[in-house]
Amino acid sequence: MNKTIDITLSPHWEDRISNEQKLRRNDQRSVFQRDRARILHSAAFRRLQAKTQVHGPGSANDFYRTRLTHSLEVSQIGTGIVAQLKLRQPEFRHLLTSTSLMESICLAHDIGHPPFGHGGEIALNYMMRNHGGFEGNGQTLRILSKLEPYTEHFGMNLARRTLMGVLKYPAFLDQVHSKYRPDDVTNLRHLKSIEWHPPKGIYRDDESILHWITAPLSEADKTLFSTFRFQKENDKVHKKTRFKSIDCSIMELADDIAYGIHDLEDAIVMGIVTRNQWQESVASKLAECGDEWFEAHINNIGDKLFSGLQYQRKDGIGGMVNALLTSITIQKSTFEEEQSFESELLKWNAYLSPSMSYALNILKKFVGQYVIHNSEMQRIEYKGQQIVMEIFDALNSDPERLLPENDKREWREAKESGTNHHRIIADYIAGMTDGYAQRLYNQLFVPI
């Protein structure tokens, strides 16, 4: 058995930004069990059932996954990763103590994504281009820490470690944005989505919450945590952050596995991809990926996936998920020759083996090529993009007339205090489901 690594975490990782005096008789739940309950029972989480994952709600086929079912599957995979890591590397068991923590992080990871998937995200980023931008992960942190009405001012008031776990990109959007900025369009229908993909990060409006989350870190760790990946100089490419907590690294792997495999299952069932496409773009490459399991079983997996029999397809999907999940190990987040983190939460991350990382990238690229960038999917995304931009334009033209009362009050308060009142409009639209946004669009623009 491997020697246990001495891991001592500061008790401040279980702190909440606001002390609570809840009337809860004989409540024996842990901090992270309470976090999980808050997320699961939140309105923002429930709304994920009517938000686009890949195939929008209202599709002709009800088999597809929504943001909500995707989040549930990410949670299941994430806790599975934790369980196998505890067995495979028991020396880290004191770092991976809580299943509820991982469930909380995974359930919450997509909670800030707007209606109509990436089309909605691009639309809001364009409309907020002069007011701090918009990005789904940054919106997730904002909902959890400010917007969800579990408390008056602090959102769900989650534990610091939970918030650190959803912090995939610990930098502000203006720090990672490319130097190049496209010209504004004169007609919203002419907006090219490829030019307005947001960088990954959080809003300047939420600077105080980032400082609170990272408060237990040493100054050296804070500096290292904020560094970017090395990349060639290119004025048109956004920078990317390099580091995240171990909890976040597990969630991100679970998210990637769910995207690469479960979204593939949706595409097979709905007839979007064919056996020939699978063979050419995936099977032929995985047969030589360097992993013994994939090389030995890839042909059999293809037979199962395209057999037309649900139990066979499920067996093939489950086999791939298991193969990826069981190839994950905990390693240092920095190179040997580099300075390492002092905090154990940042010193270690979860990683796929190189061959399995290659295999997962092949699967993700396949989903991207044949599903996400499928012309039919892109038309749906374009339509959603137009709906979101038109709604924003209307609300921003006369907020006092068109915003709901609560949002109108917040907009007034922001404007009077000199803070970013445009963010209130973005928050309102980002919280909409696909269906609600469509109905509001019809109410505003479709003749009676």
From Swiss-Prot:
It comes from the Bacteria. SMART domains: HDc (SM00471). InterPro entries: dGTPase, dGTPase-like, dNTPase_2, HD/PDEase_dom, HD_domain, PHydrolase_assoc_dom. One of its GO terms (biological process) is dGTP catabolic process. Residues 67-260 form the HD domain. GO terms for molecular function: dGTPase activity. The keyword RNA-binding does not apply. Pfam families: HD, HD_assoc. The keyword DNA damage does not apply. SUPFAM superfamilies: HD-domain/PDEase-like (SSF109604). Keywords: Hydrolase. Belongs to the dGTPase family. Type 2 subfamily. This is Deoxyguanosinetriphosphate triphosphohydrolase-like protein.
